[in-house]
Amino acid sequence: DFGHSKKIRKNVHSLTAEEQNSLRRAMDDLQDDKTRGGFQQIAAFHGEPKWCPRPEAEKKFACCVHGMAVFPHWHRLLTVQGENALRKHGFTGGLPYWDWTRPMSALPHFVADPTYDDSVSSLEEDNPYSHGHIDSVGHDTTRAVRDDLYQSPGFGHYTDIAKQVLLALEQDDFCDFEVQFEIAHNSIHALVGGNEPYGMSTLEYFLYDPIFFLHHSNTDRLWAIWQALQKYRGKPYNTANCAIVRHDTYRKPLQPFGLDSVINPDDETREHSVPRDVFNYKDDFNYEYESLNFNGLSIAQLDRELQRIKSHDRVFAGFLLHEIGQSALVKFYVCKHHVSDCDHYAGEFYILGDEAEMPFAYDRVYKYEISQALHDLDLHVGDNFHLKYEAFNLNGGSLGGVDLSQPSVIFEPAAGSHTA
């Protein structure tokens, strides 16, 4: 019974040696568990085998939700599913998180080291968090971490991913937040998995790499930070104040969590499979995070930092994104004056996808700030320039036929200022 014990989700770097050993033993046991509640079954929730829209359907697709306003809810349930499974296998704490918004030069040792010294057996054991096995294809997961993940900006500055998360946290409309939040999260999948076919950058097999759980515990923590910010701002935080409340998806069970116990044996996630029942994580799922600080900033300090950021005129590139049937890196450039002068890099982001995914199209733009890029080119809003993009697969090959529509240029005046 998980309903009466408060679980604390700790930063992976603050786990004690005993907690690390306990988590590893629990994951090792979970990976050996071939029942409906075992590792293979949970990992399949995100991709293969496909169970949606229902297991008996003639044409099925992966159940994972991307490009939709219920992305945070679906993945919050998935963290609870994993947390409960680890606790059933002996772990007594909460699902740890890897704070990838902070500067870093390597993956956490907890997930990167191939072996560890087990204090119980006094033996060197294989680290179950370094990879997982995909029974359906007979492969272990692998990683090809890209150098772009490792950034160490100076004091008072943020990594590229942290900047994208800050823009998400700035939004006080849930659906605006969700778009920025989800695209920022995509980077970790692509940067950790790289071009490896069985791992974090391949939608079918995301969840078979145990680092997924730490990544999504942090993704969920960032949603919790936004919720705390909303409460501080006097805005809705345990509901959605946007289009999600007008759609049936808000009131329908998220799958496969809402399916019967043959697919989902976890009573807790099945009983909370409707999105509106997922917001209040503290009461409904009985967990809290060790810290809701963002890069060392408390909620009040973070709010002040966001106000500081908004106190300047800013310019953004706007992309109305949709699924393209595969994962991709999108790079975009500023074109000065004429079409041939287009080699001025302005930014990049990742789209996640697969042929087996649910179709999606955002109903609002994803924004990427280009103020500094324009400043460096001595350009201003209203000058003669436009934006151009290129899409690449994760092997670096051009996806010339991908149509993401022409990016727009969005000017946002400093907060409190007025334009004619």
Curated annotation (Swiss-Prot):
Residues 1-12 have a biased composition (Basic residues). The keyword Transmembrane helix does not apply. Its main location: secreted. SUPFAM superfamilies: C-terminal domain of mollusc hemocyanin, Di-copper centre-containing domain. Hemolymph. PROSITE patterns: TYROSINASE_1, TYROSINASE_2. O-glycosylated. Residues 1-20 are annotated as: Disordered. Disulfide bonds join 52-63, 175-242, 335-342. GO terms for cellular component: extracellular region. It comes from the Eukaryota. GO terms for molecular function: metal ion binding; oxidoreductase activity; oxygen carrier activity. InterPro entries: Di-copper_centre_dom_sf, Haemocyanin_beta-sandwich, Haemocyanin_C_sf, Tyrosinase/Hemocyanin, Tyrosinase_Cu-bd. Cu cation B binds at residues 185, 189, 216. Cu cation A binds at residues 46, 66, 73. Keywords: Copper, Disulfide bond, Glycoprotein, Metal-binding, Oxygen transport, Secreted, Transport. Hemocyanins are copper-containing oxygen carriers occurring freely dissolved in the hemolymph of many mollusks and arthropods. This is Hemocyanin 2-c chain. It comes from Megathura crenulata (Giant keyhole limpet).
